[in-house]
Amino acid sequence: MRHRNGLRKLNRTSSHRLAMLRNMTVSLLKHEAIKTTVPKAKELRRVVEPIITLGKNPTLANKRLAFDRLRDRDIVVKLFAEIGPRYATRPGGYLRILKCGFRVGDNAPMAFVELLDRPEVTEAVEIEDAAE
């Protein structure tokens, strides 16, 4: 019986699944929004949320744990300098999963995964005066 085995295998070996989720975690923390399939997004949430919780308390032990899970120094620095303090008062629920239709090739359900309360990036739009 598979009772209480909530892990999604995603049709991968355990090492492939671990590497894929690690890479997706690094990409999400780097870009703060990624597009992936819905099952991968739901499994990614189980990995990313505890790592962001580590980032809220910048002790040496937590930094070592985060590096052990992420294996990217720049992302660990960003986690403890920017992302952790941003969610200091939020008790969990750092991600938003938005369904965005189906992939063209195989009709897989797709989703955007984004960090909540991320800074809005607006591009400067030049306005040309009609008088010129």
UniProtKB/Swiss-Prot annotation:
Example of a GO MF term:
structural constituent of ribosome
The answer, when asked if Ribonucleoprotein is one of the entry's keywords, is yes
* Keyword line: Ribonucleoprotein, Ribosomal protein
UniProt-listed Pfam families: Ribosomal_L17
Ribonucleoprotein keyword on record: yes
The record's GO CC annotations read: cytosolic large ribosomal subunit
Q: Which GO terms describe its biological process?
A: translation
Give the domain of life.
Bacteria
Q: Which InterPro entries does this entry report, sorted A to Z?
A: Ribosomal_bL17, Ribosomal_bL17_CS, Ribosomal_bL17_sf
Q: What is known about its subunit structure? A: Part of the 50S ribosomal subunit. Contacts protein L32.
What is stated as this protein's family in its record? Belongs to the bacterial ribosomal protein bL17 family.
Q: What is this protein called?
A: Large ribosomal subunit protein bL17
